[in-house]
Amino acid sequence: MVPLWFTLSALCFVGAAVLLYVDIDRRRGLGRRRKSWAKSHGFDYEYESEDLLKRWKRGVMSTVGDVTAKNVVLGQIRGEAVFIFDIEEVATVIALHRKVGTNVVVDLRLKGLKEPRENDIWLLGAIGPRMVYSTNLDAARRACDRRMVTFAHTAPDCAEIMWNEQNWTLVAMPVTSNRAQWDEGLRTVRQFNDLLRVLPPVPQNGSQAALPRRGGSPSRPLAPTPAGRRELPPGRADVPPARGDVSRFAPRPEAGRSDAFRRPPPARNGREASHFQR
């Protein structure tokens, strides 16, 4: 009896070793294929990234814990950053950066998949083979035009979940996806990103610029002008004239001319003015 148990234990050990070798070889093969695919597109490749997944929290990201992104590819599409990476045993994700961010989240996923786990997102309805969820149903309804309907029907089945977060648009595919499906995922995330441009942008804080100062040094700000008081031009004093002060109505003496002698005004029709007193 003892030899039988010993033989069974040995067989189990050999089987476990074979499965472990196959799994390691599969992972290495996936890494080699991903690296070769990245090189063919002019992208960069690294084996893993610890901080990459901290950028997102929705979609498939809400179902994983503190994990590390594997087989990470970094590149650019039309001047915008793009990441392709694996969440081990969960999904392969493609993330495309957006020029203009939005606070409205639109989640488009195949029917039959579990609904989003977030508490701030609601079901909008079905478009063909996919269900639409959003954090703003009115904005998402405006985005679901004819182009979105066509896209929902023609998007490949390998793009199981599509969603956006702030300045990113993401697509989740099966972790067993191949090179051809990665190319389809790139095209899909670009199309979905273009369709989401109609969403309201993130409001900009401090959009109103400060009023420029006049005649003041940056290191010495001007004192605020009291209410109801206007600035006067140079040479004018801001003192109201007294009621009995008639000097304000007196003509100013002309330069180079004495007050002792005043020339009479010119005569009209050859005669002197009768009202002028010498």
UniProtKB/Swiss-Prot annotation:
Compositional bias annotation for Basic and acidic residues: 269-278
Membrane spanning residue stretches: 2-22
Coiled-coil segments on the chain, per record: none
Entry keyword Cell inner membrane: yes
Membrane topology: Single-pass membrane protein
Segments in the Cytoplasmic topological domain: 23-278
Residue ranges, annotated region (Disordered): 200-278
Disulfides per UniProt: none
Subcellular location, record wording: Cell inner membrane; Cell septum; Cell tip
Statement: the UniProt record of this protein carries the keyword Cell membrane: yes
Keyword annotations of the record: Cell inner membrane, Cell membrane, Cell wall biogenesis/degradation, Lipid transport, Membrane, Transmembrane, Transmembrane helix, Transport
GO process terms (BP): cell wall organization; lipid transport
InterPro entries xref list: Treh_trans_TtfA, TtfA-like_core
Disruption phenotype: Knockdown of this gene leads to cessation of growth and shorter misshapen cells. Accummulation of trehalose monomycolate (TMM) and lack of trehalose dimycolate (TDM). Accumulates MSMEG_5308 protein.
GO cellular component annotations of the record: cell septum; cell tip; plasma membrane
Periplasmic-side segments: 1
Subunit structure of this chain's protein: Monomer. Interacts (via N-terminus) with MmpL3; active trehalose monomycolate (TMM) biosynthesis is not required for the complex formation. Interacts with MSMEG_5308.
Cited function: Required for MmpL3-dependent trehalose monomycolate (TMM) transport to the cell wall. Required for growth and cell elongation.
Domain comment in the entry: The N-terminal domain (1-205) is necessary and sufficient for proper localization and function of this protein, and for its interaction with MmpL3.
Protein's UniProt name: Trehalose monomycolate transport factor A
Organism whose genome encodes this protein: Mycolicibacterium smegmatis (strain ATCC 700084 / mc(2)155)
